[in-house]
């Protein structure tokens, strides 16, 4: 496990207060609309931005869960080279560059995150087995697979998961960068969660609610990474 500070270094550029507030208001509006419409809109938003080939492909991180799982695939085109996108993506995590999503909403639910808008050299190296923190009071999530410049997959394989973890469904959460040409790339987010028909009603409700919230936060994360990479690549 990597040693990680829970506060970013003093020399980095943080997200402006104005942008944080503006995006926070946007996030509240998006969250309300998505939650109210999720029974209908889920069909289209579950795989937001992904094409059929991306939805139907088998990705490396899929191997971190049992074969009986459900998938979510989301994607976005980015007008920047893959290496530029990677330099932002690899900084993901609490105490690092943040989650690139709605900082105000994250703070409202008790996550004191700081979203960073600059490349920090000390955050550019990760390895399989390193853990990324999502909340200062929660265990980190391990990196199960990683290929520098191409993908990072969070989760543990069924073979290495400990007995205590077996009581909860296995899950993998992965991001892939595919170059389209020298100046454009595609960022793909893939989530797999083990599913059982024996899930209780409360577990199914929690999964349903969690799916809506995941969409709200993940679409903003993808859009923020696009903005940062395109701004960086234009310099």
Regions found by a protein language model. Name each.
Residues 80, 84-87, 138, 172, ...:
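Short, well-structured alpha-helical interface segments that form or flank functional binding sites
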Residues 86, 155, 188-190:
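Beta-strand residues in well-ordered beta-sheet regions across diverse protein folds
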Residues 79-83, 144-151, 176-186, 226-234:
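A short, structured loop/turn motif at beta-sheet edges
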Residues 69-75, 151, 172, 184-188:
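Intrinsic-disorder/low-complexity, polar/charged segments enriched in Ser/Thr/Lys/Arg/Asp/Glu/Gln
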Residues 124, 129-157, 161, 166:
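Acidic, glycine-rich loop-and-strand cores that form catalytic or ligand-binding grooves
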Residues 2-12, 16-133, 230-235:
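Hydrophobic ligand-binding cavity/cleft-lining segments
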Residues 71-73, 137-139, 168-174:
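Short, surface-exposed coil-to-beta transition loops
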Residues 5-22, 54-55, 159-219, 223-227:
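Beta-strand/loop substructures that line and gate deep hydrophobic ligand-binding cavities in soluble
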